[in-house]
Amino acid sequence: MATVLTNTGKANMINALNGGSHTAPQHVAWGTGAGTASESDTTLFTEASEDRVSGTKTVETTTVTNDTYQVVATITADGTKTITNAGLFDALTGGDLYVKGDFTGIALNASDSIQFTIKIVQDQA
């Protein structure tokens, strides 16, 4: 199991710091495919049929004041499926994948939901 800040996510954040155009990532999706998240990933493993959800974005404190960007979103299943990965995107469709995580499958029935909390923590280590 892994959770990664993707190479595209890193590049977009640096571009924003340099004055480039930037859309804050706040859209969450989930997938049903197998695999281990990698920094080079640009998509989920088999993105599921539900639409991406716009999450609530906030700035939080993990170690030092305001060092964490956080998005919280809840997705509801449209049918029976097992969710194995999730990601944070900068668009409701298409767009760039910033954060991706894979995990042990969570079996869902129609109308079941999962609340995801995705954090990007600035760390000098």
Name each model-derived stretch:
Residues 1-84, 91-125:
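Small cysteine-rich, disulfide-bonded extracellular modules of the LU/uPAR three-finger superfamily
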